[in-house]
Amino acid sequence: EETFAELYDAVDSGKSDFENINGLCLRDGSSFKYTNPRALISDLNTVPYPAYDLLELDIYFRYSTIPYSVDAYNSRRRLSTVWERGCPRGCTFCSHNGMSRIDLQNIYGSGDRKLGEKLVREVDKENDTFQAPARWPTAQYAVDNIKLLKEKYNIDFFMAVDENMTSNLKWTKDFCNLYLDSGLSETVKWGTLGDAPSVAVHPEIIKIMKNAGCTYISFGFESAS
């Protein structure tokens, strides 16, 4: 996100030299080269909420209905949110294995996966994101996001399209408790994504989420362990 913002500003100002922007892969004749690595964003509370006002929301709301649950099907003013960055799982087929911290380490860092050495980018050590492929803002940040969408756009449903909400039990419990306290759980229902093993190990999370207005979980059955 930070790389894209800097790249946009550079293009908008008419610049054509992007080598000072961290986190890019640039063409170099018939080959390519990397600019300096960019650390993962360690404090996601610093990320501003999306500029929903730049979207044609009347058109977006027209297609709110989705057949995932009764409330999702009946929704007329649905919007999507995303708070999590990354995923704690390491599924071999997933796109995260092509854009994760570990892959960037193989370009920039030190350590040999085959020898069992830790795969660490020095830049992550320096910026407090060491071994943190999955990160979340505070649960209050997420609840405040929904409050804003309700007040500004009168939404009746939201999709939390985080990679894997159920994988972080504490965060999900905190979010659900705060969401209940906010009074939004009756007027703004929601759904999200999760993995089956997390729920198999902690089945109580389903009831907590349901009580807080969650009407569906789109499960990934990557493993039954």
Enumerate the predicted regions with their spans:
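Glycine-rich beta-alpha loop elements in corrinoid/cobalamin-binding modules
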Residues: 1-43
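Radical SAM [4Fe-4S] cluster-binding motif and immediate context
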Residues: 53-225
